[in-house]
């Protein structure tokens, strides 16, 4: 009797291991569902008794590539740990970005500290015309066609946050039309409305 019981116990253990493996695979897939971009890594020195203590900071952009994006700033003694903290911080600051057929609904300018970023809608196939920091935010947000220009500081942190402010200020054409009391056709480019209507059909 002892032998069959041991075999049964082993089968149960195998089932538990299989279940754990399946769950672990699902968790890994969930973790990699986001697009991550490391914009900047800096080394920071702190003067203490006996010398200097070094740490690293990481500016990270995380998004789902489908209208959700966030920015985080992590600090740790090692680069991988700083990036991991930045990713978690970015996820805590997720926000939704209005889009029409892969571009933004209207031109907008975002400002943060000395950073100033101008974004303009672009027709399909244009691509993301932007510098590194701006491109990281736009691609993580799932914006595929847009024109941009940095009008202020060259500081990457300021540029990223100015881009975030611009995206947060975007409104859907319906919202703009309702606020102004105008027909939808008067506040949104006809090409964008046709493209959206075609996608809906």
UniProtKB/Swiss-Prot annotation:
Residues 34-97 form the S5 DRBM domain. GO terms for molecular function: rRNA binding; structural constituent of ribosome. It comes from the Bacteria. Keywords: Ribonucleoprotein, Ribosomal protein, RNA-binding, rRNA-binding. SUPFAM superfamilies: dsRNA-binding domain-like, Ribosomal protein S5 domain 2-like. Residues 1-28 are annotated as: Disordered. The keyword rRNA-binding applies. Pfam families: Ribosomal_S5, Ribosomal_S5_C. GO terms for cellular component: cytosolic small ribosomal subunit. Residues 14-23 have a biased composition (Basic and acidic residues). NCBIfam families: rpsE_bact. Part of the 30S ribosomal subunit. Contacts proteins S4 and S8. With S4 and S12 plays an important role in translational accuracy. Located at the back of the 30S subunit body where it stabilizes the conformation of the head with respect to the body. PANTHER family: MITOCHONDRIAL RIBOSOMAL PROTEIN S5. Belongs to the universal ribosomal protein uS5 family. This is Small ribosomal subunit protein uS5. The gene is rpsE.
């Amino acid at each position: 009797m002892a032998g069959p019981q041991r075999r049964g116990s082993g089968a149960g253990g195998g089932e538990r291991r299989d279940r754990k493996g399946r769950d672990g695979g699902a968790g890994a897939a969930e973790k990699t569902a986001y697009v991550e971009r490391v914009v900047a890594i800096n080394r920071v020195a702190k003067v203490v008794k006996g010398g200097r203590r070094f740490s690293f900071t990481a500016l990270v952009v995380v998004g789902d590539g489908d209208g959700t994006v966030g920015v985080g700033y992590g600090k740790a003694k090692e680069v991988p740990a700083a990036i991991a903290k930045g990713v978690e911080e970015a996820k805590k600051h997720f926000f939704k970005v209005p889009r029409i057929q892969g571009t933004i609904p209207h031109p907008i300018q975002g400002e943060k500290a000395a950073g100033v970023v101008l974004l303009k809608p672009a027709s399909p196939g244009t691509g993301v015309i932007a510098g590194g920091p701006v491109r990281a935010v736009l691609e993580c947000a799932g914006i595929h066609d847009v024109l941009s220009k940095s009008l202020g500081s060259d500081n990457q942190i300021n540029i990223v946050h100015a881009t975030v402010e611009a995206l947060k200020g975007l409104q859907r054409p319906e919202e703009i039309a309702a606020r102004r009391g105008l027909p939808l056709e008067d506040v949104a480019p006809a090409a964008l409305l046709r493209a959206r209507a075609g996608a809906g059909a």
